[in-house]
UniProtKB/Swiss-Prot annotation:
Top-level taxonomy: Bacteria, Bacillati, Bacillota, Bacilli, Bacillales
Boundaries of every PRC barrel domain copy: 94-165
Primary location recorded for the protein, binned into one broad class: cytoplasm
Protein name (Swiss-Prot/TrEMBL): Ribosome maturation factor RimM
Any Gene Ontology biological process: ribosomal small subunit biogenesis
Quaternary context: Binds ribosomal protein uS19.
Gene: rimM
Localization per record: Cytoplasm
Job of this protein: An accessory protein needed during the final step in the assembly of 30S ribosomal subunit, possibly for assembly of the head region. Essential for efficient processing of 16S rRNA. May be needed both before and after RbfA during the maturation of 16S rRNA. It has affinity for free ribosomal 30S subunits but not for 70S ribosomes.
Listed SUPFAM superfamilies: PRC-barrel domain, Translation proteins
C-alpha cells in the first residue's frame, strides 16, 4: 500500500536540495539515505533514492541520488511524495498508529455525537495534536485523558473532550 509522506514545498540552494513538508510518521526511517520515494508530478510516478536528509526549521531537507542542480528538481515544487508502506522494521507499540490510518477517521464524543474528521496531525514534542474538521476546526491532543478509543478498521475515534476543547 502506498502512503503519502509529504509534499515538496520549495528548493533550497543551488545544489538540488528540496524542502519537504512531512505529513507522515517515522520520518527518521522514511527519509533516511537509501530509501526510495515516489514523486508524483503531472500524473507521472518518478522514483528517487534519498541521498541525504536533515531537518531545518520544521521542514525536511532532502537530496536525491543523481540530482545535483536546482534546475533538475525545481519543476517538482508542489508535488506529493509517496512511499510503500512495507517497513517491517517499524514495530508499533500499543496505542501507536500510522498517521495514514488516523487521517480520515471520524471523531465522536463519548455520547456518540460526531465532531468531524481527522484531516492532519502535528507533532508537538510532548504529544501529537490531531486536527479535526467539523463545523469548525478543532485541535485535539492525542493523550489518554482525551482519546478513549481508536478503531482504525472502522475509521472511528471516540474522545472525551476536556472543558473548552470544542468551544
Amino acid at each position: 500500500m502506498r502512503v503519502e509522506v509529504g509534499q515538496i514545498v520549495n528548493t533550497h540552494g543551488i545544489k538540488g536540495e528540496i524542502k519537504v513538508k512531512s505529513n507522515s510518521d517515522f520520518t527518521d526511517v522514511r527519509f533516511q539515505p537509501g530509501q526510495v520515494l515516489t514523486v508524483v508530478h503531472n500524473n507521472n510516478d518518478l522514483e528517487y533514492t534519498v541521498k541525504s536528509h536533515r531537518v531545518h526549521k520544521g521542514l525536511h531537507m532532502l537530496t536525491f541520488e543523481g540530482i545535483n542542480n536546482i534546475n533538475d528538481i525545481e519543476h517538482l515544487k508542489g508535488s506529493s511524495i509517496y512511499q510503500e508502506r512495507d517497513h517491517e522494521d517499524i514495530v508499533l507499540e500499543e496505542n501507536e498508529f500510522y498517521y495514514s490510518d488516523i487521517i480520515g477517521c471520524t471523531v465522536f464524543d463519548d455520547q456518540e455525537t460526531p465532531i468531524g474528521r481527522v484531516i492532519n496531525i502535528f507533532e508537538t514534542g510532548a504529544n501529537d495534536v490531531w486536527v479535526i474538521k467539523g463545523s469548525k476546526e478543532y485541535l485535539i491532543p492525542y493523550i489518554a485523558d482525551v482519546v478513549k478509543e481508536v478503531d482504525v478498521e472502522n475509521k472511528k475515534i471516540i474522545i472525551t473532550p476536556m472543558e473548552g476543547l470544542l468551544d
